Amino acid sequence: MGKITFYEDRAFQGRSYECTTDCPNLQPYFSRCNSIRVESGCWMIYERPNYQGHQYFLRRGEYPDYQQWMGLSDSIRSCCLIPPHSGAYRMKIYDRDELRGQMSELTDDCISVQDRFHLTEIHSLNVLEGSWILYEMPNYRGRQYLLRPGEYRRFLDWGAPNAKVGSLRRVMDLY
């Protein structure tokens, strides 16, 4: 079970809302979000309702202002708890749509897709085990996308505007 608390003001001040499960619409509970405390679990928060817009991965810890989670604004409108995973992590990445082309397999974090696989774009992928976060830039920076087990036949399937990928990280409570 997870627990996340959203605060309207920085430094955990102002009106707050505690959440322990997925919530597709946080708008009724607060008008803005400037700080977050994650007491347990790993979470993905979204700038728009229904898990749309920019995504941000949060694990246990304190985030006293939205820059701490690399947010672009104080708008957080939905969240989901990422189920814990205790087994192996495995993903296949492809340089073409529809799970075609050059295939490479990952079982651990990748700080630079370009350095490791000589790719700057991933056009499709298949998450076989565990949940992952895809980052548009190396060193786990830039836009983030949650990848749960399943096939993603094109970059639009994971919500990206293009196939640019810089790094990939396993969703784990501790790093």
Swiss-Prot record:
Pfam families: Crystall. Keywords: Cataract, Eye lens protein, Repeat. One of its GO terms (cellular component) is nucleus. It comes from the Eukaryota. One of its GO terms (biological process) is lens development in camera-type eye. One of its GO terms (molecular function) is structural constituent of eye lens. Residues 2-40, 41-83, 89-129, 130-172 form the Beta/gamma crystallin 'Greek key' domain. The keyword Transit peptide does not apply. SUPFAM superfamilies: gamma-Crystallin-like. Residues 84-88 are annotated as: Connecting peptide. Belongs to the beta/gamma-crystallin family. Has a two-domain beta-structure, folded into four very similar Greek key motifs. Monomer. It is linked to Cataract 39, multiple types: An opacification of the crystalline lens of the eye that frequently results in visual impairment or blindness. Opacities vary in morphology, are often confined to a portion of the lens, and may be static or progressive. In general, the more posteriorly located and dense an opacity, the greater the impact on visual function. CTRCT39 includes lamellar, anterior polar, and complete cataracts. Crystallins are the dominant structural components of the vertebrate eye lens. This is Gamma-crystallin B.
